[in-house]
Amino acid sequence: EMLQDAARQKASDIHMLPALNGFKVSFRIAGHMVDVTHEHFFPASQVENVTNLIKLMDDSRNVDVMRTNMPNEGSFYLHRGSQDIFIRLETLPVGSDGQEKINLRLLPQAGRTQSTKKTLDSIGYIPEDLDAIKSVLYRNATGMFLNSGPTGAGKTTSLHAEIHYVLDSVQEPLNVIEIAEPIEIYEDDFTQVQVRKAANEALNLTAEKILVASLRSDPDIILYNEIRNSTDATVAMQASNTGHRVFSTVHAADCTRTISRLLDFDISKTTLLSELKLIISQRLVATLCPYCSKPHTLTEKERRLLTPREMEQVEGRLREKGSAADIQACPHCNHGYSGRTAIAEYVIFNTEIRDALLHQRSFGEIQEVLSKNNFRSMWEKGIDMAMQGKIELDELIHVVGK
């Protein structure tokens, strides 16, 4: 019942934390933690049994019910009507009496029809960003296309949408190989290989091993889960340099930090910059319900944070979540929010940017290069969205930051 309710409310995560009176249960809805303990109450006497029951749902065979003093990581499926929801299970030992905190991440699967798959148009990119991103994807037959951001920023979903745009553009089958840890979005038309750890280290199926093998499997597109180090970057560059499109992620806060991190790898700057075609950095922000939101008055903290120009932009135009009574009475929204949308910044690598970055390395120098090429940050675009009443300024500050 709890899992079905979380799916109905479009929760991305379920958190179950053992407390004195039982589990404290929270759903993450539109990026915000919502306490649902009263709706899904598990008393202290049931904590151990409920924990074991959830661990037994694991289909991956990685979870040990008896292992309570170490983290567990597994997965299983929830079937809800015609939709399958892939659920990632994580347990973490807490306290000293063998209790475990449970986190369940809900990943709805697109299904088998193309019409239900996530597209670039449905992610929430503003029209001018969408046109620019589509253009660079369409005109480049090889190269590296990267998405950056923290966990939960929608990087994997965006990469899949980018690849589907390429597939729709060429209008012919392409050999797409995905290397994932773990597979989060199942695709009928992709060759999807999951990184596996074995008791015998020699039998570990690492991302690097899969990537090297993939290059011998006649790929058109390679979706590589994450570039973590110089080795990953080198193999990814080799793949793009030999006539492939390579899509991957980098854990970095924004485009400037992504470039800085890549340039710090022990690899050829010239080769790296020649292969890079696109970097997108993004966050997912909660969108206000247009029916029950209300005007927002700037706080003193917010006034100190904004520049005079930003103050002039947003003064009298901001909105915030409605009152508790209004939200409860509203038939249109979910806890005051209508959903989540992406705020993105991007860098398209042209000759001017490549030449400039070849001789620059510091954070400030990279920022200067981008600003000279009409770069607009997530913060700047977020201010526009707040000014239009689509998102709360507080949401922008806490999710994107300035």
Q: Each PLM stretch: what is its role?
A:
Residues 121-135, 309-402:
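NTP-binding/hydrolysis catalytic cores, primarily Walker-type P-loop NTPases
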Residues 252-351:
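Cys/His-rich Zn2+-binding cysteine-cluster or related metal-binding knuckle/ribbon modules and their
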Residues 5, 9, 53-64, 92-94, ...:
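Conserved, well-folded catalytic cores of nucleic-acid-processing
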Residues 143-147, 160-286:
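Switch/coupling sub-region of P-loop NTPases
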Residues 1-153, 157-158, 383-402:
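N-terminal "pre-motor" subdomain/linker immediately upstream of P-loop NTPase catalytic cores
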Residues 20-22, 33, 83-84, 92-96, ...:
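Conserved nucleotide-binding/hydrolysis micro-motifs of P-loop NTPases
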Residues 14, 87, 136-137, 181, ...:
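Residue-level signature of catalytic and energy-coupling elements of molecular machines
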Residues 1-4, 48, 52-56, 131-135, ...:
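Solvent-exposed alpha-helical segments within well-ordered globular domains of core cellular machineries
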